[in-house]
């Protein structure tokens, strides 16, 4: 049974893990264990069971929504007597740093690509629309990286607007976590996919976040279905620190890495720095700008230890 809170009206239906898993309804798992290992993040435990119980039901739900949207487009074309343009279905994925947004996005890209109705699924992260480090330094915003003011929101909104307008070819800038900066001339080309997955901290922001400029257009205005990946902050901080330590042993050891100096730190000092980065930047951004957007999502998936999703809330 779906949980219904009798004492408090809510716009969401709530499912525990078992209830949600039952909604898979015989959808086959088309990914192998080796493929799943390639898709998961550096700090996540992702099992075949997790994919089958959580992400297959989600891909089934999204397939229903996307098919419904295609039928609506066909009705409009019939009414207008036109062939119409191919308009991608945009899925937004939001949540804190270290919560596993990228893994969720990559998994959905792989699963949705396997549905026969829509094979073309593109994935874009909003990191590419951060201002280059040169600009952030000039504006004194390097310690606000990931905050709303650190993004080129005009370019991001323009990109999503062009995609939803049916433009045949749209380019998006690419971000490198190795150099901690936007890649010069590293654009990714998007050519009318069936589905565009847009993953980032800020995809659910709206005019409510900018009362001084309520008439601004936002990314969320162009998103058809949005997912917020949630977890308690103490888990998020722990995941962030563990990820930092793994990067210190791996990616940071690359001489080209922006954080190469961190690879030489003793572990206690590395933990202190990661904790400081969380408290002064990522945790602050979560509380001020990311968490307040959670209840705007079409679906909220809440994680417990080991990145296992323990419940799902679906907007009615």
UniProtKB/Swiss-Prot annotation:
Statement: the UniProt record of this protein carries the keyword Transcription regulation: no
Alphabetically ordered keywords of this record: ATP-binding, Coenzyme A biosynthesis, Cytoplasm, Kinase, Nucleotide-binding, Transferase
Gene Ontology terms: biological process: coenzyme A biosynthetic process
Coiled coil: none
GO-annotated cellular components: cytoplasm
Pfam families registered for this protein in UniProt: PRK
Enzyme Commission number(s) from the entry: 2.7.1.33
GO MF annotation, one: ATP binding
EC primary class: transferase
Highest rank taxon of the organism: Bacteria
Compartments (UniProt record): Cytoplasm
Functional pathway: Cofactor biosynthesis; coenzyme A biosynthesis; CoA from (R)-pantothenate: step 1/5
Signal peptide: none
InterPro entries for this protein: P-loop_NTPase (IPR027417), PanK (IPR004566), PRK/URK (IPR006083)
Catalytic activity as recorded in UniProt: (R)-pantothenate + ATP = (R)-4'-phosphopantothenate + ADP + H(+)
Chain positions recorded as ATP binding sites: 95-102
Primary location: cytoplasm
Assigned protein family: Belongs to the prokaryotic pantothenate kinase family.
Name of the protein in question: Pantothenate kinase
Gene it is expressed from: coaA
């Amino acid at each position: 049974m779906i949980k219904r809170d009798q004492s408090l009206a809510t716009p969401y239906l709530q499912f525990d893990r078992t209830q949600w898993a039952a909604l898979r309804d015989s959808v086959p798992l088309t990914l192998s264990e080796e493929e799943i290992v390639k898709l998961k993040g550096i700090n996540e435990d992702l099992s075949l069971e997790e994919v089958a119980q959580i992400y297959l039901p989600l891909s089934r739900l999204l397939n229903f929504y996307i098919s419904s949207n295609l039928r609506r487009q066909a009705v409009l074309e019939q009414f207008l007597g036109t062939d119409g343009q191919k308009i991608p279905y945009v899925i937004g994925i939001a949540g804190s740093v270290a919560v596993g947004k990228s893994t969720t996005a990559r998994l959905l890209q792989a699963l949705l690509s396997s549905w026969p109705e829509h094979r073309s699924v593109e994935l874009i992260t909003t990191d590419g629309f951060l201002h280059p480090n040169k600009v952030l330094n000039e504006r004194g915003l390097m310690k606000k990286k990931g905050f709303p003011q650190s993004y080129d929101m005009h370019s991001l909104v323009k990109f999503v607007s062009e995609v939803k307008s049916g433009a045949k070819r749209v380019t998006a800038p690419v971000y490198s976590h190795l150099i901690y900066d936007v890649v010069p001339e590293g654009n990714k080309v998007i050519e009318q996919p069936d589905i565009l997955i847009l993953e980032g901290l800020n995809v659910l922001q709206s005019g409510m976040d900018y009362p001084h400029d309520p008439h601004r257009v936002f990314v969320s205005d162009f998103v058809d279905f949005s997912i917020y990946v949630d977890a308690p902050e103490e888990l998020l901080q722990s995941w962030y620190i563990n990820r930092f330590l793994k990067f210190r042993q791996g990616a940071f050891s690359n001489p080209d890495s922006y954080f190469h100096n961190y690879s030489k730190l003793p572990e206690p000092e590395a933990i202190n720095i990661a904790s400081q980065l969380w408290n002064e930047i990522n945790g602050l951004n979560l509380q001020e700008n990311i968490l307040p957007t959670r209840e705007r999502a079409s679906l909220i998936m809440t994680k417990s230890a080991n990145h296992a999703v323990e419940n799902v809330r679906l907007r009615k």
